[in-house]
Regions:
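Catalytic cores of extracellular degradative/oxidative enzymes
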Residues: 192-373, 382-383
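Exposed low-complexity, polar/acidic, P/S/T/G-rich flexible segments that act as propeptides
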Residues: 152-198
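Beta-strand-enriched, solvent-exposed domains that form extended recognition/catalytic surfaces
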Residues: 37-172
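Short, glycine/alanine-rich hydrophobic alpha-helices that insert into or span membranes
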Residues: 13-26
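Beta/coil-rich, acidic/histidine-enriched accessory regions frequently appended to metallopeptidases
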Residues: 39-53, 401-480
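Active-site-proximal alpha-helical
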Residues: 344-433, 437-443
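Bacterial N-terminal signal peptides that target proteins for export
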Residues: 4-16
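Sec-dependent signal peptide cleavage junction
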Residues: 23-41
C-alpha cells in the first residue's frame, strides 16, 4: 500500500515479544560501588584534571520525572517511554566512570542505548546501575552513551561525572544552533553517536546519517525538534493528556543497525529505525509530509492495553498517526491510499467478522469513523475513561476487551453504538447489548459507517458535544 506497507515490516513480533521482558530487563552490575569518604575528598582535584571538557558538560541537574513503569501502568499503556536523561558523554568498553551524586537520594545511570548498541533481542547489553549518594565508580564491558534516570516524582538530583567519558555531539533545543551542530560534527567526526534533545523527544543517530539526512536535506535541527515536539503534543491530546498530566520522559527515536530484516519498530523505551529509515526522522520535510512511519511507531508507545484486543496492535496506534497527519495539514492516508472503497466493499458483505479483516487500514476505518462522527474529543475522553477505571475492573481477555470497548465507546458518545459495531461485524454479546441499552442513550440511526474524511457523517442526536468530562468518567462496571 504505497509507502505504508514498509512500515509494517516485522514490527508485530518486536512489539509483542519484548514488552514483558523489557519491563524486568534491567541489569545491575557488580562493578558499581560507593566510596563515600576518601574519594569524595578528591572530587575537586579530579575535576581540575578534566581540563579538556567544560565543567557544565560534566555536571547535571537531573529532574525527577517519575518511574516510567509506574506511569505506563497509570496511563494503561503497553510500553513505557524512555527513562534516559542524556549527558552527551560516551563510555568506552570497560572504561571506569566516576560519578559524584549530591544529596541523599539514589539515582540510576545507564551505559548504552537501547537499539543503537544492540538489537531489540539483546537488551541485556545495556547496563543499568544504582548510584548511592557520594562517589560511585561504574563500568560496562560493552560501553555506550551515558544516561541518568531519576525515578523521583518531582525535584532534582545533582550529579557530576568526575572522571571518564568522551564528549560527543549533543544538540539541545534552546541552547544550540544549526551551526553549533555543524561545529560539533567537525570537532568529533568519529563520535560513537550524535544526540539531539527537544522538550519531549530524544534522537540518537550516527554521525554519518546525521550529516547525510539532516544536514544533507538542509534541515534546521531547531525546527526539526520543534516539529517533533509538536507531533508528540498532538498525540498527547489524542490520549487526553494535558501538558501538566503527561509523562515527561522522552519519546526516543533511535537509529538501529543490528536488525537488517526490519524497517522500523517500537518497543518499550524507544522507537527504532533500521539503517537509512532514520531519514524519516532526521529530514524535516520527510517527517512532516511523509512521516507516517515515525508517527506510527510513536503511536505504539501510546496504545492502551484495555482496548487493544485481537489483531489491533497495528490498527489502534494509527489513530495517533492520522491525528498528526491531519494536524500537519497532510491528505488523509485513508483517502489517498484508496482505503475507504475497500472498507465499504467489506461493509456490504452479509456475514462479517471484524476480527478476520486482514487489512489493518480497513480495520482502522471503523475507529476513525468514530472520531469523524463524534469529533476530536472522542478519543481523549475514551482514554480518560480507561485511566479512571479501577485496575481490578480492567479486562484481561481479548473478548472482554472487545465487549468493554463497545460499552465504553457508547458511554463516551452518549449514544447506543450497537448498530455501528454490528455493521462492522464486531459482534456484541447479549450482555453487552443489555449494558449499552441500560445506559439509556438514544440508539444510533445515522449511517456513520459511510463517513469519510472528506464527507464525515454526524449522528442525528441532540447535544452530541455534551460529552462527559474529567472525574465524571469515574464509574464501575458493577451493576451496569
Amino acid at each position: 500500500m504505497g509507502n505504508n506497507s514498509k512500515h509494517k515490516t516485522r514490527k508485530i513480533l518486536a512489539a509483542t515479544a519484548t514488552v514483558t521482558m523489557l519491563a524486568t530487563g534491567m541489569i545491575f552490575s557488580s562493578d558499581v560501588f560507593a566510596e563515600q569518604k576518601e574519594q569524595q575528598k578528591n572530587l575537586s582535584t579530579s575535576l581540575q584534571k578534566e581540563k579538556s571538557v567544560k565543567s557544565e558538560n560534566r555536571t547535571f541537574t537531573v529532574p525527577g520525572k517519575g518511574d516510567v513503569e509506574v506511569l505506563k501502568e497509570q496511563e494503561r499503556k503497553s510500553m513505557a517511554f524512555s527513562p534516559y536523561e542524556p549527558t552527551g558523554l560516551y563510555a568506552k568498553p570497560n572504561e571506569q566512570i566516576t560519578i559524584n551524586v549530591e544529596g541523599n537520594q539514589d539515582i540510576q545511570v545507564y551505559i548504552g542505548t537501547y537499539s543503537y548498541d544492540a538489537s531489540w533481542r539483546e537488551d541485556s547489553k545495556i547496563k543499568s546501575f544504582t548510584l548511592k549518594p557520594g562517589i560511585n565508580t561504574i563500568q560496562s564491558p560493552n560501553g555506550g552513551m551515558i544516561y541518568f534516570y531519576n525515578k523521583q516524582q518531582g525535584g532534582t538530583i545533582r550529579t557530576t561525572i568526575t572522571t571518564g567519558g568522551t564528549t560527543t555531539p549533543f544538540f539541545e533545543l534552546g541552547k544550540h544552533t544549526k551551526q553549533d551542530l555543524i561545529n560539533m560534527l567537525d570537532q568529533y567526526p568519529n563520535a560513537h553517536a550524535v544526540e539531539l534533545k527537544g522538550e519531549r523527544v530524544l534522537i540518537t543517530a550516527s554521525p554519518a546519517r546525521v550529516k547525510k539526512y539532516l544536514l544533507g536535506s538542509n534541515t534546521d535541527p531547531v525546527q526539526l525538534l520543534k516539529k517533533m515536539d509538536e507531533a508528540t503534543r498532538i498525540q498527547d491530546k489524542v490520549a487526553g493528556l494535558s501538558e501538566e498530566q503527561v509523562d515527561k520522559h522522552y519519546v526516543h527515536y533511535v537509529e538501529e543497525n543490528h536488525s537488517p530484516d526490519y524497517y522500523m519498530y517500537a518497543t518499550s523505551y524507544r522507537t527504532a529505525y533500521v539503517g537509512d529509515a532514520i531519514q524519516y526522522v532526521l529530514d524535516i520535510n520527510k517527517f512532516v509530509t511523509d512521516g507516517w512511519g515515525p508517527w506510527h511507531e510513536a503511536g505504539h508507545l501510546r496504545q492502551q492495553s484495555p482496548w487493544k484486543f485481537y489483531n489491533m496492535t497495528e490498527v489502534q496506534n494509527n489513530i495517533y498517526s492520522l491525528s498528526v497527519e491531519k494536524a500537519f495539514n497532510q491528505p488523509s492516508n485513508l483517502e489517498k491510499s484508496g482505503i475507504y472503497p475497500k472498507a465499504f466493499q467489506y461493509l456490504e458483505q452479509v456475514n462479517k467478522n471484524y476480527d478476520e479483516i486482514s487489512d489493518v487500514f480497513v480495520k482502522l476505518v471503523m475507529l476513525w469513523q468514530l472520531q469523524l462522527a463524534y469529533g476530536e474529543d472522542f478519543y481523549p475522553k475514551l482514554h480518560q475513561l480507561y485511566r479512571d477505571m479501577p485496575s481490578s475492573e480492567l479486562p484481561q481477555t481479548d473478548e472482554n476487551k472487545k465487549q468493554l470497548f463497545m460499552i465504553s465507546a457508547s458511554k463516551v458518545a452518549k449514544q447506543n453504538l450497537i448498530p455501528f459495531f454490528e455493521k462492522w461485524g464486531l459482534r456484541p454479546n447479549n450482555d453487552t447489548i443489555q449494558k449499552v441499552a441500560a445506559l439509556g442513550y438514544p440508539v444510533l440511526t445515522a449511517e456513520i459507517w459511510k463517513g469519510t474524511d472528506s464527507n464525515p457523517i454526524k449522528p442525528d442526536m441532540p447535544n452530541v458535544n455534551n460529552i462527559l468530562e474529567g472525574n465524571q468518567f469515574a464509574w464501575s462496571l458493577k451493576g451496569i
